């Protein structure tokens, strides 16, 4: 049985968007692209490692930086220019990204 990630971290300011169900994707680089569809993952804050909620991974798809569009911004619950700026700050000079789609597990 292959192991798969069971934890994912988000900036604290994004966690209310996740727990409200507004944010349904995350864009990551290849090092964080190994999530497996139909698995449950615990969400923690990056800054304080506080558990926030659980999500179910729906899909993991390759995405180039220049393909990020209004649809992704809507799913991220952030305006497109802000989203692109944030991605560039986190992953400078990386164009090969992955979009991870998920849903909130309501307990």
Swiss-Prot record:
Reaction catalyzed: N(4)-acetylcytidine + H2O = cytidine + acetate + H(+); N(4)-acetyl-2'-deoxycytidine + H2O = 2'-deoxycytidine + acetate + H(+); N(4)-acetylcytosine + H2O = cytosine + acetate + H(+)
SMART domains (UniProt xref): ASCH
Cellular component aspect of the GO annotation: cytosol
Stored InterPro entries: AC4CH, ASCH_domain, PUA-like_sf
Signal peptide (from-to): none
Presence of keyword Hydrolase: yes
PANTHER family: UCP029143 FAMILY PROTEIN (PTHR38088:SF2)
Name of this chain's protein: N(4)-acetylcytidine amidohydrolase
């Amino acid at each position: 049985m292959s192991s798969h990630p069971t934890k994912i971290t988000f900036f604290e300011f994004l966690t209310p968007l996740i727990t409200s169900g507004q944010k349904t994707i995350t864009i990551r680089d290849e090092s964080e692209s190994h999530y497996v569809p139909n698995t449950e993952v615990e969400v923690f804050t990056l800054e304080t490692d506080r558990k926030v909620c659980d999500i179910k991974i729906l899909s993991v798809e390759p995405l180039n930086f220049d393909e990020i569009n209004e649809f992704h911004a809507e799913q991220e619950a952030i305006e497109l220019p802000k989203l692109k700026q944030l991605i560039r700050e986190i992953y400078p000079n990386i164009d090969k990204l992955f979009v991870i789609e998920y849903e909130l597990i309501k307990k």
